[in-house]
């Protein structure tokens, strides 16, 4: 287990996190044209101006078009590396991943949680200014 955990919520003591803390974006639906709305980002970290976004899916299905557009733009314009993973959020077992890098979307590939941990560790070294790994930018 990691030495540090920023998530300090105890559902047994404080109630269901989703009920108590997850915003209902419905109040903002009429603010945007068409079907545009806020999306939740499952995880994001910034190191030296570089962004790593994590999107969790329960299975390796088609990424919604709106998210594809957003992730392509973010990866092209904001030095963001977006990784979508699929798996079991309760057990944290990841089975597939795809990435968005430099405006392009990859395809779902089989991958393990351990491999994603390794990918994120390499990305952090790259973001901190270490030797860039081509594999990190390509999501492999």
Where are the model-predicted features located?
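Domain-level recognition of nuclease-like catalytic cores that cleave nucleotide substrates
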Residues: 10-25, 88-140
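Intrinsically disordered, low-complexity and often Lys/Arg-enriched segments
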Residues: 1-2, 140
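Active-site metal-binding core of divalent-cation-utilizing nuclease and nuclease-like domains
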Residues: 2, 9-47
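Alpha-helix C-cap/termination motif
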Residues: 46, 74-77, 126
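Conserved catalytic cores of phosphodiester-cleaving nucleases, focusing on short active-site segments
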Residues: 43-45, 49-59
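Catalytic cores of nucleic-acid endonucleases
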Residues: 4-6, 31-38, 58-104
């Amino acid at each position: 287990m990691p030495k540090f955990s920023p998530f300090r919520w105890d559902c047994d003591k404080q109630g269901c996190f989703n009920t108590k803390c997850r915003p209902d974006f419905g109040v903002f639906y009429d603010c945007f044209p068409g079907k545009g709305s806020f999306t939740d980002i499952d995880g994001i970290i910034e190191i030296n101006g570089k962004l790593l976004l994590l999107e969790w899916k329960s299975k390796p299905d088609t990424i919604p078009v709106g998210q594809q557009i957003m992730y392509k733009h973010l990866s092209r314009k904001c030095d963001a590396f977006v990784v979508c993973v699929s798996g079991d959020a309760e057990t944290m077992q990841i089975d597939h991943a795809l990435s968005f890098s430099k405006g392009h979307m990859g395809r779902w590939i089989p991958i393990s949680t351990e491999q994603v941990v390794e990918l994120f560790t390499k990305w952090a070294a790259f973001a901190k200014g270490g030797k860039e790994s081509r594999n990190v930018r390509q999501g492999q």
